């Protein structure tokens, strides 16, 4: 496994489909930004070989593809500290919260995921975003509120100015192949994308899988926003007649070539699709009456 240097103190490793950044507090002690999308024995081996100690992990958010090595890191470094925004920490505090904030459909599914990725022995310290900073030793990590992809998604700026924006946007390569980028709250996600475009930093680490300079970030943001507007338009166009939630979601996912399958992953995908309709309802473009969804520009005609 290779450590890719961005500055003297900040770099990243590539795990699966994600970059995991880190900042060195000393020559051999570092803070990671997220812990990766899959358990990585290679990461643990690299830490052993180089005699590096991970003092803390600052989570941009608590989706399972950003916390997969938390348990291994805790086993290796029992005094490690995990941080996330208070909203993210609260989102996994109970199965009921996971249903409310993370798209799970049942307590059983939430408990299954909680047992694997958010066990009781891993305590995530919630940070009040009014504070917007974490100090570790004499080093300060700035936090940027970027909700939308998740309830309390956060950007993390290392003490030397590298801006790690998690999943607030995705790279151009990922955007080209992604059928339905995950959004918990569409309106907030779009506002956060616009916020990213206005940030002053020179270097940005996008979790799935890109390092970009300030000069390029505005175009990537515009492309992410355009993709979301396209997906919203397609969602609206599915309602050629009054339809139930299940009917329109099945049609939407078929149009996007998303194959239906069993399992928790599909539960989250369906919720991801439904967030587009929640946003359209909030915009007043769609309304729900008697268990049916109507396009507002056709609702009067269809209801008469």
What kind of region is each of these model predictions?
Residues 237-304:
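C-terminal regulatory/interaction regions
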Residues 1-50, 155-166:
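Conserved beta-strand hairpin/beta-sheet module of binuclear metal-dependent hydrolase folds
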Residues 230-238:
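Pre-recognition alpha-helix immediately N-terminal to the DNA-recognition helix
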Residues 67, 189, 273:
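Aromatic/hydrophobic pocket-lining residues that form the small-molecule binding cavity
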Residues 140-229:
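Metallo-beta-lactamase
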Residues 39, 45-133:
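Active-site HxH/HxHxD metal-binding segment of metal-dependent hydrolases
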Residues 15-18, 128, 147-150:
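A short catalytic or substrate-binding loop motif that flags glycine-/basic-rich loops and adjacent residues
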Residues 32-36, 55-63, 83-86, 145-148, ...:
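Active-site neighborhood of phospho(di)ester-bond hydrolases with catalytic His/Asp-centered motifs
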């Amino acid at each position: 496994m290779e450590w890719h240097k961005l500055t003297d103190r900040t770099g990243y490793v590539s795990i699966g489909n994600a970059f995991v950044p880190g900042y060195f507090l000393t020559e051999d002690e570092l803070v990671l930004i997220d812990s990766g999308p899959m358990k990585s024995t290679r990461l643990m081996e690299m830490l052993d070989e180089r005699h590096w100690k991970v003092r803390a992990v600052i989570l941009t958010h608590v989706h399972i593809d950003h916390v997969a090595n938390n348990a291994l890191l805790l086993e290796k470094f029992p005094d490690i500290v995990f941080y996330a925004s208070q909203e993210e920490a609260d989102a996994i505090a109970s199965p009921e919260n996971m249903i409310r904030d993370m798209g799970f459909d049942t307590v059983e599914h939430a408990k299954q995921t909680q047992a694997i990725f958010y066990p009781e022995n891993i305590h995530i310290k919630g940070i009040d975003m009014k504070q917007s900073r974490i100090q570790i030793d004499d080093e300060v990590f700035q936090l940027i509120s970027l909700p939308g992809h998740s309830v309390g998604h956060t950007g993390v700026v290392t003490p030397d100015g590298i801006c790690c924006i998690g999943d607030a946007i995705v790279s151009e390569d990922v955007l080209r192949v992604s059928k339905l980028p995950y959004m918990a709250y569409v309106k907030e996600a779009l506002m956060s994308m616009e916020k990213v475009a206005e940030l002053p930093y020179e270097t940005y680490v996008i979790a799935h899988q890109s390092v970009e300079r300030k000069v390029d970030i505005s175009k990537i943001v515009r492309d992410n926003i355009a993709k979301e507007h396209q997906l919203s338009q397609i969602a609206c166009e599915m309602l050629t007649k009054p339809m139930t939630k299940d009917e329109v979601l099945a049609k939407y996912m078929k149009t996007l070539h998303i194959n239906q399958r069993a399992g928790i992953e599909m539960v989250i995908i369906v919720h991801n699709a439904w967030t587009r309709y929640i946003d359209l309802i909030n915009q007043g473009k769609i309304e729900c009456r008697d268990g049916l969804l109507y396009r507002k520009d056709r609702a009067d005609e269809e209801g008469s």
